[in-house]
């Protein structure tokens, strides 16, 4: 043992000899002789510290030393001022607190002394946390720590707080304040009355979370004001208007009256208590409790008024008046009414039901329904049955109006009495499992249920709402019925099943199912535009939900397009195809119709007035269902004029009328002519006649679009359309324009000879305008009034130079040709007389020459001619043109041409 002590002593001596610092204080800095110094800390720990270097000198920075909470003074000269950088929160209860203490010891490693207001704190060292621990007594307010006269910590105890209003128990006369850090809490009481003790002492609990104050004044009602201070400083002021308060009457008040106990608060008087019962004064007994008081109530007979809801008040010490409560004698009183599910049964709860003799339900505008008492509960007829003194079973009539009802109960005593009305609500109920069928146009539905009289307690109508959801079907209710049903008008719709929800004041009360009738197809009709009209029933009005299926004989199907629909008919467009016999099935929503047909489509013509060109040309016949017509088996005539078929499709027939030659002119007259389409195929349907009058086409009347100028030979060219030469007549200023010649290739131009040419010469040619009209087949057709401007031609012009003018050469050539033609014509006349066949052959070659000339002329016109306001083409001024035109004006030649044509 001695060896151990000697070893420890040597160890301490070695530490003192070899762990001694070589640092000194120079000019406010700690200068050391070595770069690496060894320090012994307070907890016996030896640390090697590297010094800061400045040249060849070494310095120690104690403030940045990481273990300064364990660093002692280095020697007698180098002393550090202790520091407490932080301190835990200090509740007013005090206790043990651990804290960090920097530079805690002197160079001999003794703990430096710290004190609070000259009271030295005892310190201990917690080696596990390297912290010092001290104990603090309960207190409040500022908390300061100093060392050697230097303050090293300034803080405070935690501040007291009272989160809730203090509790005043006037039955015990105690005020309780609850909160935290309530050390040194005091109160001051203020009142209108004189107080014995305005500043009572409080009792603080160990946790400083509750303090109680007892005062005799708290036992009686008063209007208190209490100021609370914590740690000598005002905290808050509280008001306690503690006036008497009645809650209820205990027990049962029978007809004889008597002493009744009333419970409440602040009911202890100092002197006396008075009360009122209705309009009568009652006596009350003094009590030592603030929570109850006893008062004497008169009998119902002495009271002399209705025994329900009688107001009661008390007044304490003639100054403090309580609130008012209402009490009743022990008479029947309804407290609640509840319906059993959706039935006609209602449970009534309340008090004093044993003597009930009659019940009345009041609805609407004071409509009364008496309910008879039954000896036993029954569901067969309306009535009520008393189950106990607190419950009544009621079976209401099913035609009782829903809404807020008033229930009246008779007392059953010796005196006539009616209990107060109790308002309760009855909701209509729909009988479950109801289903209805309707046409697509809608129907009136009778919905069964109970309590279906839809009025409220004021007699006003409360409509039932019936629909299948947002955006769905609606059934608009009519006036309510006898309570067992109501009627609503179902709107148009379709579909096999719809759930209709019924709402009363937006509350769902049931539902029923509606199914619309499936569609039915009957007869069919064809329309002019090619659509098909189907007649039937329950076809609906929704085109977007409609599907028409066309079923062919081989079972193949294709959908038509429904374009219009009503409840009794629909119109659909037949699908494109080449089969005209089929059956039809119509689907509306999820329901399909019967299979109607088969029906055979007849060809139908849509354009009944296609304006057939009078001069011949292409005629387009628009229609539908030309399935079986072919070019080889079909013939078309318009009047007596044949129209040669060029093409046939399902919807169009194109045919060509030959040019209007004179030999056919009686058939090419203007006006309306019957159209006949026939087929040699016996399986081809005849054209469908929309009207008994049949189909009639009109030949287009002639029109005039422009004219040329009158040339020197009085010849004018007229441009237009449908220039047929059947009984053709042209008038210029009501004078005939003779010898008309029609362009037989286009029938859009003709030339004629102006008969009043000589008369026109007297006018100023540059300004004169003339009217032109044209008629075909003896009828005048004035498409428009056209005017043309006469332009004079220069017949001769003198040439100042020597020699003959060009016109003289032209005249000479014309004269020679004229003599030749006269000779040729005379020869032909003689040959015709003797040899007719031979002359006809010669004239036929001349006619071919004439046709070639006209064809060339027509080609030239077509190059320049357009409809509208474009000017007519200028005449060909070539020598050949003038010779040809002059020859065409010779009467003998024209007469020959005419005879040959005829």
UniProtKB/Swiss-Prot annotation:
It is found in: Cell membrane. Residues 825-902 are cytoplasmic. Disruption phenotype: TgrB1 and tgrC1 double mutants show strain segregation in chimeras with wild-type cells. The keyword Glycosyltransferase does not apply. It holds the Pfam family TIG. Residues 249-323, 603-680, 704-788 form the IPT/TIG domain. Residues 1-24 form the signal peptide. It comes from the Eukaryota. Coiled coil: none annotated. The gene is tgrB1. The chain crosses the membrane at residues 804-824. Residues 25-803 are extracellular. tgrB1 and tgrC1 are involved in kin discrimination. They play an essential role in aggregation and subsequent development. This is Tiger protein B1. It is a single-pass type I membrane protein.
């Amino acid at each position: 043992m001695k060896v151990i002590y000697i070893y420890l002593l040597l160890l301490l001596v070695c530490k003192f000899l070899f762990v001694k610092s070589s640092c000194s204080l120079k000019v406010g800095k700690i200068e050391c002789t070595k770069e690496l110094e060894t320090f012994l800390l307070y907890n016996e720990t030896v640390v090697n510290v590297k010094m800061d270097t400045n040249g060849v000198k070494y310095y120690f920075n104690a403030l940045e030393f990481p273990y300064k909470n364990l660093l002692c003074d280095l020697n007698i000269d180098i002393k550090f001022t202790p520091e407490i950088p932080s301190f835990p929160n200090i509740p007013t209860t005090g206790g043990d607190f651990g804290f960090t203490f920097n530079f805690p010891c002197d160079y001999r490693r003794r703990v430096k002394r710290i004190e609070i207001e000259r009271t030295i704190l005892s310190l201990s060292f917690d080696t596990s946390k390297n912290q010092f621990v001290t104990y603090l007594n309960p207190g409040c307010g500022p908390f300061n720590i100093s060392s050697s006269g230097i303050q090293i910590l300034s803080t405070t105890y935690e501040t007291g707080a009272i989160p809730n209003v203090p509790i005043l128990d006037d039955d015990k006369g105690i005020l309780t304040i609850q909160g935290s850090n309530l050390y040194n809490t005091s109160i001051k009481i203020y009142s209108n009355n004189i107080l014995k003790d305005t500043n009572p002492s409080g009792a603080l609990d160990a946790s400083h979370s509750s303090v109680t104050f007892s005062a005799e004044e708290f036992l009686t009602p008063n209007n208190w004001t209490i100021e609370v201070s914590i740690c000598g400083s005002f905290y808050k002021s509280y008001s306690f208007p503690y006036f008497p308060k009645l809650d209820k009457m205990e027990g049962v008040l029978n007809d004889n009256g008597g002493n009744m106990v009333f419970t409440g608060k602040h009911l202890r008087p100092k002197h006396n208590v008075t009360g009122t019962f209705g309009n009568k004064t009652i006596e009350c007994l003094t009590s030592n409790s603030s929570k109850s008081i006893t008062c004497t109530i008169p009998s119902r007979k002495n009271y002399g008024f209705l025994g329900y809801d009688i107001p009661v008040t008390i007044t304490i010490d003639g100054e403090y008046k309580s609130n008012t409560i209402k009490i009743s004698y022990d008479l029947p009183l309804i407290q609640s009414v509840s319906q059993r599910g959706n039935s006609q049964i209602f449970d009534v709860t309340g008090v004093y039901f044993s003597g009930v003799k009659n019940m009345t339900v009041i609805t609407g505008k004071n409509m009364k329904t008496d309910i008879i008492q039954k000896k036993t509960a029954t569901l067969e007829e309306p009535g009520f049955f008393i189950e106990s003194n607190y419950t009544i079973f009621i079976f209401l009539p099913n035609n009782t109006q829903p809404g807020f009802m008033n229930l009246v109960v008779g007392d059953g005593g010796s005196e006539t009495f009616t209990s107060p009305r109790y308002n309760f609500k009855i909701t209509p109920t729909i009988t479950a499992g109801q289903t209805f069928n309707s046409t697509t146009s809608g129907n009136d539905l009778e919905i069964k249920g109970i309590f279906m009289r839809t009025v409220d307690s004021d007699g006003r109508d409360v409509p039932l709402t019936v629909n299948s959801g947002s955006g769905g079907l609606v059934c608009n209710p009519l006036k309510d019925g006898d309570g067992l049903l109501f009627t609503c008008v179902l709107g148009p719709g379709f579909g096999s099943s719809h759930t209709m929800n019924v709402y009363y004041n937006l509350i769902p009360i049931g539902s029923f199912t509606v199914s619309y009738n499936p569609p039915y197809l009957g007869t069919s009709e064809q329309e002019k535009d090619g659509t098909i009209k189907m007649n039937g029933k329950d076809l609906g009005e929704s085109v977007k939900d409609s599907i028409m299926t066309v079923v062919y004989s081989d079972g193949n199907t294709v959908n038509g397009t429904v374009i219009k629909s009503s409840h009794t008919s629909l119109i659909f467009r037949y699908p494109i195809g080449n089969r005209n016999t089929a059956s039809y099935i119509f689907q509306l929503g999820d329901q399909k119709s019967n299979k109607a047909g088969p029906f055979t489509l007849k060809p139908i013509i849509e354009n009944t007035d296609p304006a057939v060109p009078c001069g011949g040309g292409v005629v387009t016949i628009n229609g539908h269902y030309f399935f079986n017509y072919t070019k080889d088996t079909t013939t078309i005539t318009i009047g007596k004029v044949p129209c040669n078929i060029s093409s046939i499709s399902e919807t169009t027939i194109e045919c060509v009328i030959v040019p209007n030659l004179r030999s056919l002119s009686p058939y090419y007259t203007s006006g309306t002519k019957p159209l006949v389409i026939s087929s040699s195929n016996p399986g081809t349907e005849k054209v469908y006649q929309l009207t008994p009058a049949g189909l009639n086409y009109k030949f287009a009347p002639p029109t005039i679009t422009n004219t040329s100028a009158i040339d020197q030979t009085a010849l004018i060219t007229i441009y237009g359309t449908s220039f047929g030469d059947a009984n053709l007549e042209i008038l210029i200023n009501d004078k005939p324009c003779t010898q008309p010649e029609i362009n037989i290739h286009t029938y859009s131009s003709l030339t004629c000879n102006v008969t009043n040419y000589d008369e026109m010469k007297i006018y100023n040619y540059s300004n004169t305008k003339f009217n032109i009209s044209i008629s075909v087949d003896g009828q005048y057709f004035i498409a428009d009034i056209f005017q043309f401007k006469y332009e004079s031609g220069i017949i001769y012009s003198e040439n100042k130079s020597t020699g003959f003018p060009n016109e003289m050469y032209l005249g000479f050539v014309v004269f020679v040709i004229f003599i030749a033609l006269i000779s040729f014509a005379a020869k032909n006349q003689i040959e015709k007389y003797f040899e007719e066949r031979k002359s006809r052959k010669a004239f036929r070659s001349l006619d071919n020459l004439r046709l070639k000339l006209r064809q060339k002329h027509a080609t030239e016109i077509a190059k320049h001619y357009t409809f509208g306001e474009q000017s007519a083409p200028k005449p060909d001024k070539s020598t050949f043109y003038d010779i040809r035109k002059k020859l065409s004006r010779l009467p003998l030649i024209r007469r020959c041409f005419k005879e040959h044509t005829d």
